[in-house]
């Protein structure tokens, strides 16, 4: 039996700690800027919204340096990472690095990077953008998707974990 952690006295920290108990998958969301240049970041704020049409949602902080690039992108791709891709998750969450240098990826039909070795890939067209507090919600219509059978990478309690059966 686990021992409950004492709650933080700061409401924002308590909210973050509570949300950290919700296990999520880990993705890299990427878009083309211009030929040979791409923008991408690690995200766990990703979910399906609708089956008809197929829609997904993800969020990006309003203070993110890549916000303007994604706001102007008409297409992007979501790569759902495999449990052996922790290094990629770290790389795409760090500022001031060429995130795509040396990374094995291919371009989808609309030119967005698809990370090799991921467990799923979704190629999306921009559908809607909504402000939500200190983040922007991006809704994408899935134009193509593919998957492979492999264990996904999981984010829980502020750390990366392997999925359990």
Please report, for each region that a protein language model flagged, where it lies by residue.
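Basic, polyanion-binding surface patches
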Residues: 1-165
């Amino acid at each position: 039996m686990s021992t409950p952690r004492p709650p933080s006295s700061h409401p924002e920290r308590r909210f973050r700690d509570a949300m950290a108990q919700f296990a999520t998958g880990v993705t890299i969301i990427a878009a083309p800027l211009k030929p040979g240049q791409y923008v991408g970041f690690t995200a766990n704020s990703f979910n399906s919204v609708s089956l008809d049409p197929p829609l997904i949602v993800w969020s990006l902080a309003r203070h993110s340096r890549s916000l303007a690039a994604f706001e102007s992108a008409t297409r992007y791709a979501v790569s759902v990472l495999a449990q052996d891709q922790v290094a990629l998750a770290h790389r795409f969450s760090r500022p001031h690095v060429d995130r795509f240098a040396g990374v094995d990826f291919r371009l989808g039909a609309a030119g967005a990077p698809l990370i090799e070795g991921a467990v799923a890939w979704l190629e999306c067209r921009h559908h809607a953008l909504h402000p939500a507090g200190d983040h922007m919600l991006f809704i994408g219509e899935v134009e193509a998707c593919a998957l492979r059978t492999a264990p996904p990478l999981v984010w829980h309690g502020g750390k990366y974990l392997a999925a359990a059966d």
